[in-house]
Amino acid sequence: MSAANMPTTTGAQGSGNQVPRTSTTIVNHRELIKEPKNLDEAANYLFQTLLDDAVVGIFNETHHLRKSGNLAALDGVPEDSTYRMCEMPNLDIFGISTAKKPMDCTCPNCDRLVAAARFAPHLEKCMGMGRISSRIASRRLATKEGATSAHLHSSGNTGGTDDEDDVDWSSDKRRKKSNQNSRNNGSKKNNGKTF
């Protein structure tokens, strides 16, 4: 039996005819293999049958997708350029530079450029809101009030002398320091022991 006499496949007629068609192909191939002279012819027949099945299957599937309107679904959704990954050096996948930038902030109070790491302490000092700044501000207010009250008392005829109205700020500081030293002397140096 020659390849010209073999039945050729003309396409897939459905999944129901697939099993008988495969069995006829196998039977025809076995008949060709029986004679050693026909091995080349049998290989060509098998290759041609497989190629025809594959091509006809693809054509049928494409035709079905085109008729049903689903052919465009094979292409998929086009990718937006905004969502593409960036593959440039020194940039991350979103296109943002990975190099370190010095971060500077502008102080809203004095309009100076301040490093981001120093912005909070600067703002505290600049606005007078921190612990140390509030102490300084309270001293300023106390000195202003003391100066204005002393000025009012001395300008009026209250009969007092200037020495009585003066507030001795340095003596208060000395007194505070001496009180703190006396507290620490007994507890830290001697550990509560007296000699």
UniProtKB/Swiss-Prot annotation:
GO CC terms in record: cytoplasm; DUBm complex; nuclear pore; nucleoplasm; SAGA complex
Residue numbers carrying Phosphoserine: 171
Region Disordered: start-end pairs: 1-22, 140-195
Keyword Transcription: yes
Primary location recorded for the protein, binned into one broad class: nucleus
The keyword Protein transport is annotated on this UniProt entry: yes
Keywords for the protein's UniProt record, in alphabetical order: Activator, Chromatin regulator, Cytoplasm, Metal-binding, mRNA transport, Nucleus, Phosphoprotein, Protein transport, Transcription, Transcription regulation, Translocation, Transport, Zinc, Zinc-finger
Function statement: Component of the transcription regulatory histone acetylation (HAT) complex SAGA, a multiprotein complex that activates transcription by remodeling chromatin and mediating histone acetylation and deubiquitination. Within the SAGA complex, participates in a subcomplex that specifically deubiquitinates histone H2B. The SAGA complex is recruited to specific gene promoters by activators, where it is required for transcription. Required for nuclear receptor-mediated transactivation. Binds independently on SAGA to promoters in an RNA-dependent manner.
Similarity section: Belongs to the SGF11 family.
Source species: Drosophila sechellia
Subcellular location: Nucleus, Nucleoplasm; Cytoplasm
Cited Pfam families: Sgf11
Signal peptide residues on this chain, from the entry's feature table: none
Family matches, as InterPro entries: SAGA_su_Sgf11 (IPR013246), SGF11 (IPR051078)
UniProt protein name: SAGA-associated factor 11 homolog
Top-level taxon of origin: Eukaryota
The record's note on its domains: The long N-terminal helix forms part of the 'assembly lobe' of the SAGA deubiquitination module.
GO biological process annotation, one example: chromatin organization
Zinc finger (SGF11-type) in chain: 105-126
GO molecular function: transcription coactivator activity; zinc ion binding
